[in-house]
């Protein structure tokens, strides 16, 4: 027997008690979950405390609760249309009597107006009737938009703090951070069908300056958010422990020249600013322009991916249901987003079984390791798709990685605890399955560096540098510590494993 073999065997024997203990604590926690499935208060508390990893599908402007938005509107001296609940610019009517255009501040003393605004700006108290969930949901953004656009730091602070309170450690916020600068630049450049020439024209017109200014502005907002949360002080809020990155959010419902300019800006930002880890295309997939221009948008993504091959891409696709659009528009968006849009992740993916050759697509997504960002509450409220009608179990059956996501938790009146709770109650997931989804959220994050995991297909097998260490241990080996120091993604994953160990000790 060689000396190396003896050393390896000794290492196994040294680690075996810890590995058995970790396995036993996981099994014990799983048994506890099984014992409380029919006790909602205990189940809710368990899921709330569960370490959830990351939220990869979170629109910053939709993450803010209406109560915060009312405060923002009051700070800005805005008015509200009493009939529609839409914010308006001043001057406002007095609060002393019933008026059509009261100041937002009037709502503090008028509970009817306050509750009306909260209901109009969210899905609270919405009931199916004349207005669909889809229409009520998306109409909310225009109603509160004047307040959300001017309070970016406050929005970041509020959303990040809720993430921390919800036992998340990482968030990728979708945010159109340039304030319309790319759209203005597009207006100065004549449209060219040749994407290379269009890119050259936009760069010549100052796109790199727009990217630099956008990054500078967001850095200031990010720093201000940390001040609001009192990070670095004894009174630091829970959000201070959350790692935040951004996805540049392209508004695909705008004219094609603006969409191209925004996509280009997204690629430029993700290539030059560490805060921006990728880009996404947003706005309702069923609206006219996103449907009509879908193939052109994929062509734009295909071209610019060739120019910026290292930039990460996640795309909304399949946020559709039968009856919302003609049947033919249900048949290709997810596949096109993966194959031509080069998406590493798909947001929603609800209409996957309406795609041409859906089983073939599922196998392709599993082979390409494309993760689906699952937003259960959002899909129920907007599309009316839930329970057995939702494809989440089908994705899992075919080995497609998934992670739960909040989407627009402020508008939905939800949070990540509710997403996990809905998943447990609806699909009866085991504790091991919940851990897997949380781990996948960080595995498929766009953080730089190598993964802690060498394999995630069946079991999570550690990278060689950390193979001899208990995941999440406070004192990893020198080689593992060096690996973690060099790879941010692995560091976040190691942190999650430590949180799991702490969580499981309670059971």
Task: Walk through the language-model features, giving the residues of each.
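Intrinsic low-complexity/disordered segments
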Residues: 4, 18-20, 313
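Bacterial N-terminal signal peptides that target proteins for export
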Residues: 1-9
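Bacterial N-terminal signal peptides
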Residues: 8-18
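Metal-cofactor-binding active-site regions of metalloenzymes
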Residues: 23-507
């Amino acid at each position: 027997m060689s000396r190396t073999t003896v050393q390896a065997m000794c290492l196994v024997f040294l680690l075996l008690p810890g590995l058995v203990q970790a396995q036993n604590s996981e099994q014990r926690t799983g048994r506890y979950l099984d014992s409380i499935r029919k006790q909602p208060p205990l189940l809710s508390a368990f899921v709330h405390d569960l370490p959830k990893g990351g939220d990869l599908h979170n629109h910053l402007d939709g993450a803010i609760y209406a109560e915060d938005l009312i405060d923002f509107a009051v700070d800005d001296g805005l008015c509200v249309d009493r009939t529609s609940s839409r914010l308006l610019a001043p001057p406002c009517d007095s609060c002393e009597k019933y008026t059509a255009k009261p100041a937002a501040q009037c709502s503090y003393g008028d509970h009817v107006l306050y509750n009306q605004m909260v209901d109009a700006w969210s899905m609270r108290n919405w009931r199916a009737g004349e207005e669909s969930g889809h229409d009520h949901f998306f109409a909310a953004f225009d109603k509160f938009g004047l307040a959300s656009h001017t309070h970016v730091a406050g929005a970041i602070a509020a959303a990040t703090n809720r993430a921390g309170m919800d036992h998340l450690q990482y968030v990728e916020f979708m945010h159109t951070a340039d304030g319309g600068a790319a759209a203005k630049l597009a207006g100065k450049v004549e449209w060219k069908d040749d994407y290379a020439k269009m890119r050259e024209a936009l760069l010549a017109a100052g796109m790199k300056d727009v990217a630099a200014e956008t990054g500078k502005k967001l850095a200031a907002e990010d720093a201000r958010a940390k001040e609001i949360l009192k990070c670095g002080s004894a009174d630091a809020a829970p959000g201070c422990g959350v790692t935040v990155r951004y996805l540049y959010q392209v508004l695909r419902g705008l004219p094609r020249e603006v969409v191209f300019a925004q996509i280009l800006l997204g690629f430029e930002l993700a290539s030059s600013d560490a805060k921006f880890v990728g880009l996404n295309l947003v706005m309702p997939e069923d609206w006219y322009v996103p449907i009509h221009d879908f193939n052109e948008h994929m062509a734009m993504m295909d071209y610019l991916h060739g120019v910026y091959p290292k930039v990460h891409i996640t795309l909304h696709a399949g946020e559709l249901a039968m009856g919302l659009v003609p049947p033919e528009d249900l048949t290709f968006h997810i596949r096109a987003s993966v194959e031509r849009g080069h998406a590493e992740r798909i947001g929603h993916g609800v209409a996957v079984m309406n795609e041409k050759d859906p089983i073939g697509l599922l196998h392709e997504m599993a082979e390409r390791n494309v993760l689906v960002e699952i937003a259960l509450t959002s899909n129920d409220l907007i599309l009316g798709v839930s329970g057995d009608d939702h494809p989440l179990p089908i994705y899992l059956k075919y080995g497609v990685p998934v992670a739960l996501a909040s989407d627009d938790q402020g508008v939905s009146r939800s949070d990540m605890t509710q997403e996990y709770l809905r998943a447990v109650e609806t699909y009866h997931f085991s504790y091991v399955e919940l851990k897997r989804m949380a781990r996948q959220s960080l595995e498929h994050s766009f953080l730089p560096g190598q993964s802690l995991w060498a394999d995630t297909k069946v079991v999570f097998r550690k990278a060689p540098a950390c193979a001899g260490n208990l995941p999440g241990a406070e004192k990893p080996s020198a080689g593992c510590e060096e690996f973690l120091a060099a790879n941010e993604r692995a560091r976040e994953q190691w942190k999650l494993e430590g949180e799991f160990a702490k969580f499981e000790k309670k059971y």
